[in-house]
Amino acid sequence: MVFVGRQDELQVLEKLYENSKHSFQMAIVYGRRRIGKTSLISQFCKNKHAILFTAREQTNIENLRDFSRVVYDFFNLPSTTGSFNNWNDALDFVAQQSNAVDQNAPKSPLILVFDEFPYAAQADKSLASTFQVAIDHKFKNANMTLILCGSNEGFMESEVLGKKSPLYGRRTAQIRLQPFNLFEASELMPNNATWEDKINYFASLGGTPYYIEQLDNKSSFAENLEQLCFNISGILYAEPDMLMRQELRDPSTYNSVLNALATGCNTPTLISDRIGLPATSVNVYLKTLEGLGLIERNIPFGMNPLHCKKGLWQICDPFFAYWYRFVAPNKGLIERGLSHAAASSILGGEHEAFSTFVGQQFEKMCEQWIVHQCKVGGMDFLPTKLGKWWGADPIAREQTDIDIVAEDDINKQLLIAECKWRNNLNEAESVSKLLQRATLVENAKNSDYKKIFMLFTKYPTSYNPRHAKTSINFVDAQTMFFN
């Protein structure tokens, strides 16, 4: 598989590697399963002296035995050599060999990658302390880079990065690997995918590399999704259930919370009413899911997140949003052998519910396009704040929203955008509403800011803005991939 993206992360690791020629370096790399940690580390370690070890959910003795084999193999020692007695001896040996590598190849420092560190640390509660001693006394004079990786984000943040961790303050870099954006993900999609297929794929699978890599180049969008998600033996059919069981102690309750969110219950009170738990208990589950990067709490643009009571929760990972919206309700049909009928009812033709779902995801894609354009210089705009606004329109006397609002405090600019994923669009009406709603996000601070108006559409527009007093920037979905 071709390596795609992650250039910023590679740059961080390469800088660490250069620094390790003069002093010890330590990186913490984490992110949930399937996100591409192994691919990133493998790409970074190409043509370098690297020991690559992955712990497993097994006893401490078994992990130590596996580590011993990997280390002995790297240093070309006989396979009959006995395992290390403990982790202290193992790390002491690596430190000694690192110094030997330094003498023989001073321009090629050693890299030690310890993947799935949480598994080993849970099997040996003193492992973090053992690494701390090794870093402070054995590795500190070694020209090497230590990379600790993990998929359990909660563990990595509390037990490795947290203030109470023995390893606190010893890292020289940390990377929380995020899903690809639309444009990075599209590079992994089938060659026969049209721009609309790419939008649909990203809306359904999101930016997790592993999910996208499962797509068959010879199959259509509908065929791929049916095979992966609506087939009882499909690779992604049970994916959310497996992640819940692996990461969480009470998967059934978390599953209920996600089901409630997928049906539109977006506050703790609504979720509480739906699943029968006290709202205070629901908040605990929401925070945990937020920590996993599966859900997020949104507040209207411009409000203080610490004091705002208008926050709404939603599933932010597109695949989980798709799975809980369309796959979970049809599990009964799928497990009775009616997977094709279940998939066809959703994927066949212009299914209204799916089109509405894509429209919701399209808003996030447009946000990503704006950020991407700002990053590559396509827009002279620095989004210091970015979000969505909703609330009361005092003139229209109704509740309304604005899909995207971004503020550039540095250059004193305010960007206001609407996203319309529709086959038939009244362009003049959309432009009129966009301009009218701009006043709803104005305040004493930004009232004199330059206003930038954008309208994102599914297809190119024919609207003639010559009579408009304000300039409108039109961006259609196809153009997003070529600009």
Predicted regions and their residues:
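N-terminal pre-P-loop "Q-motif" helix
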Residues: 2-14
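Sensor-1/coupling segment of RecA-like P-loop NTPase cores
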Residues: 27-30, 119-123, 133-164
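Conserved NTP-binding/hydrolysis module of P-loop NTPases
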Residues: 47-51, 57, 61-80, 93-96
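Conserved P-loop NTPase "ATPase switch" module shared by AAA+ and STAND
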Residues: 98-127, 131
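Interdomain motor-coupling "hinge/lid" segment immediately C-terminal to the ATP-binding subdomain
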Residues: 156-253
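Accessory nucleic acid-recognition modules appended to NTPase machines
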Residues: 215-217, 222-402
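Conserved catalytic cores of phosphodiester-cleaving nucleases, focusing on short active-site segments
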Residues: 370, 400-423, 434, 453
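Domain-level recognition of nuclease-like catalytic cores that cleave nucleotide substrates
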Residues: 447-483
